[in-house]
UniProtKB/Swiss-Prot annotation:
Attaches the virus to host receptors, inducing clathrin-dependent endocytosis of the virion. In the endosome, the acidic pH induces conformational changes in the glycoprotein trimer, which trigger fusion between virus and endosomal membrane. Homotrimer. Interacts with host LDL at target cell surface. Residues 262-316, 391-413 are annotated as: Trimerization. Glycosylated by host. Palmitoylated by host. Belongs to the vesiculovirus glycoprotein family. Glycans are attached at N183, N343. The record marks H80, H182, H431 as: pH sensor in the pre-fusion state. The chain crosses the membrane at residues 476-496. Residues 1-20 form the signal peptide. It comes from Isfahan virus (ISFV). One of its GO terms (biological process) is symbiont entry into host cell. InterPro entries: PH_Rhabdo_glycop (IPR055448), Rhabdo_glycop_CD (IPR055447), Rhabdo_glycop_FD (IPR001903). This is Glycoprotein.
Length: 523
């Protein structure tokens, strides 16, 4: 036990005194929004399997493979193209109908590049719908061609140099202009640098050829492997030139150089394989730091099984250590989940993982270089929760009195101390809203947006009166009767007034009638 502690102390001292960078993947944010992990949740990053053939003879030779170029990060943009149309239907009888519509268009490479440049410069404008242009007795369209740019990071397949995202039709893309499942949307990486395929570096590796005890007569009897090629069956291998060099194209599309001097039991190795089909392409063997990290993890840890074992512990309500939590973390840049323990409950949060270079698995300050090994040290994490007398960060990262420790990478280097073995009870949460969340919204629900932008049509307003003929007939009958009654009253009132007046009676006087005023005057 004393010797073990002594060796651990020596290794810790070595890490403290050296400054070689270790590449890891870590969340790009310093804080995350955590939510409880519900019971039954189980997600693990997958890893490749190694199938080794026993009882085979082995021959080894030195070969060169193209290293390729690993994408520096997973940042990129979604480029949307659309035609925004304002339509004015100006009827001959006066009203104007204004409608708006959006029509999808396939963006071009030049349009997307120009839109991204404008977006980064802060000059990309979203004008919206154009103002209407109305011509009498005609239908007129006003159009704007709109380019929208949305930041969208994707995953990186280090082994093949592909972009990986569910938006891609085949879930992967290896060009600088990637189609998506939406015809009007394309994805382009942030870094648009181009490289000559033959200008890349070729690195020497040791390739082993395994074959039966009897003399092989064809390539299908062989199996090739190296520390970067786990198990390559010969029946899927063919010979072809790459950058004017002889070699073999493996079943996974990668290429290794094989010279004419490489012999296998007095036969040239190349002669055992058929020629590749015309037009065959090759993939680079990416010996970048990202791949070395992935291989280093795969060699020392069975990622998938260890992750599943952690979930089994959670289901059995067994205590977990910081190392157990580290097995749940993603291994490559892109989208992923981060995990932490809060008050005895397992919490998770969606995160964007990026490449980070740290000086050692044990740091005095939680700082590292993002996106480049030659970058500037920045703070990696600021959100800590209590954990058995220590403080816990994402995916098992722990803060102790002796420094900040990354359990996964300490374990990969053979450094195990008491802090990594501290256990804590962790349980998933049965969220009370789960039954409610499973309800579906009624399909009969309608949303009314109104008739804004449409002038009233007098003809349609009048025709609307006749939508119900019974009510209309009753209304017209009532109106006619009302008019007749009014006219009748107007004619009847004068007659009534005349009857009420008294007639003047004229009386005749005999004496006065016989009186002649002229005779009286002459007298």
């Amino acid at each position: 036990m004393t010797s073990v502690l002594f060796m651990v102390g020596v290794l810790l001292g070595a890490f403290g005194s050296t400054h070689c960078s270790i590449q890891i993947v870590f969340p790009s944010e310093t804080k995350l929004v955590w939510k409880p992990v519900l019971k039954g949740t189980r997600y693990c990053p997958q890893s490749a399997e190694l199938n080794l053939e026993p009882d085979l003879k082995t021959m080894a030779f030195d070969s060169k493979v193209p290293i390729g170029i690993t994408p520096s990060n997973s940042d990129g943009y979604l480029c949307h193209a659309a035609k925004w149309v304002t339509t004015c239907d100006f009827r001959w009888y006066g009203p104007k109908y204004i409608t708006h519509s959006v029509h999808s268009l396939r963006p071009t490479v030049s349009d997307c590049k120009a839109a991204v440049e404008a977006y980064n410069a802060g000059t990309l404008m979203y004008p919206g719908f154009p103002p209407e242009s109305c011509g009498y007795a005609s239908i007129t369209d006003s159009e704007f061609y709109v380019m929208l740019v949305t930041p969208h990071p994707v995953g990186v397949d280090d082994y093949r140099g592909h972009w990986v995202d569910p938006l891609f039709p085949t879930s992967e893309c290896n060009s600088n202009f990637c189609e998506t499942v939406h015809n009007a949307t394309m994805w382009i990486p942030k870094d648009l640098k181009t490289h000559d395929v033959c200008s890349q570096d070729f690195q020497t590796i040791r390739v082993s050829v395994m074959y039966p005890q009897t003399k092989p007569t064809k390539g299908a009897d062989l199996t090739l492997k190296s520390k970067f090629h786990a198990h390559m069956k010969g029946d899927r291998v063919c010979k072809m030139k790459f950058c004017n060099k002889n070699g073999l194209r493996l079943g996974n599309g990668e290429w290794i150089e094989v010279g004419d001097e490489v012999m296998l039991d007095n036969s040239k190795l190349l002669s055992l394989f058929p020629d590749c089909l015309v037009g065959s392409v090759v993939k680079s063997t990416l010996l970048s730091e990202g791949v070395q990290t992935a291989l280093w993890e795969t060699d020392r840890l069975l990622d998938y099984s260890l992750c599943q074992n952690t979930w089994e512990k959670i289901d059995r309500k067994e205590p977990l250590s910081a190392v157990d939590l580290s097995y749940l973390a993603p291994r490559s840049p892109g989208k992923g989940m981060a995990y932490i323990v809060a008050n005895g409950s397992l919490m998770s949060a969606p995160a964007r993982y990026i490449r980070v270079w740290i000086d050692s698995p044990i740091l005095k300050e939680i700082k590292g270089k993002k996106e480049s090994a030659s970058g500037i040290d920045t703070v990696l994490w600021e959100q800590w929760l209590p954990f058995n007398g220590m403080e816990l960060g994402p995916n098992g990262l722990i803060k102790t009195k002796s420094g900040y420790k990354f359990p996964l990478y300490l374990l990969g280097m053979g450094i195990v101390d008491q802090d990594l073995q501290e256990l804590s009870s962790v349980n998933p949460v049965d969220h009370p809203h789960v039954p409610i969340a499973q309800a579906f919204v009624s399909e009969g629900e309608e949303v009314f947006f109104g008739d804004t932008g449409v002038s009233k049509n007098p003809i349609e307003l009048i025709s609307g009166w006749f939508s119900d003929w019974k009510e209309t007939a009753a209304a017209l009958g009532f109106a006619a009767i009302s008019v007749i009654l009014i006219i009748g009253l107007m004619r009847l009132l004068p007659l009534l007034c005349r009857r009420r007046k008294q007639k003047k009676v004229i009386y005749k006087d005999v004496e006065l009638n016989s009186f002649d005023p002229r005779q009286a005057f002459h007298r």
